[in-house]
Amino acid sequence: MTITEIKNLLQGEVSKEQLEELKADERKGVQKLLISYEKRQAKYAKALAQFQSRFSYEKEFWQKDQLVAGVDEVGRGPLAGPVVTAAVILPHDFDLIDVNDSKKLSPKKRQALFPKILEKAVSVSVGLANNDVIDQINIYEADRLAMAHAVQGLKVKPDALLVDAMNVPLNIPQVKLIHGDAKSNSIAAASIVAKVFRDNLMDAYGELYPEYDFKHNAGYGTREHMEALEKYGPTPIHRRSFAPVSEYEK
């Protein structure tokens, strides 16, 4: 085989016999390709092991034939826009090994995973609390309310919840996990769904209120955002209970 043919071969599945043949090939180009292949395989094996370890909490419920939903939120800190939550029930054979804490993933990777999670999950639901609700009952309670809405929106009722550092106000057994999106694939999937949903929503708000640069700041208090607040005052989606938004009321 030519070097190009071997390179193409090593991009897919390779049998043990083929690998042995290639290892016996003394061409430097072939040996260099083999080194790269083995590095990729080692990296994949490590990622797969980490992915499988993030199902340890789910397996405790699966072993009892119970459905478990991961629940997470995004958007507690911004000065504008809603807090968005998601609840996700994953099947036992879920195999998207790139699913991880959404904060560890690039926007491009999150957007790519979003439709795949929707396709492979048993059920996905999103809940949100807008800025008016946040101003009325505070961000913590609004977050809990949105989580409850997300869980209630699932097409099948879970037997238990895995929740990232919160308690959901529902009569369902729950496991609260600090940094849960890095410990549970179900919570990680929920974090990706919530993040992409909110980012897309803030992009739409960016079209509606272009002066505030919501497409790039997602409602957080960047310099451009603060300058727009000072110049134009708050929009209908700003959280008046958050300092310093109220200071800029016109």
UniProtKB/Swiss-Prot annotation:
Its main location: cytoplasm. Manganese or magnesium. Binds 1 divalent metal ion per monomer in the absence of substrate. May bind a second metal ion after substrate binding. Its EC number is 3.1.26.4. GO terms for molecular function: manganese ion binding; RNA binding; RNA-DNA hybrid ribonuclease activity. GO terms for cellular component: cytoplasm; ribonuclease H2 complex. Residues 66-250 form the RNase H type-2 domain. It is an enzyme of class 3 (hydrolase). SUPFAM superfamilies: Ribonuclease H-like. Disulfide bonds: none annotated. Pfam families: RNase_HII. Endonuclease that specifically degrades the RNA of RNA-DNA hybrids. This is Ribonuclease HII. It comes from Lactobacillus johnsonii (strain CNCM I-12250 / La1 / NCC 533). The gene is rnhB.
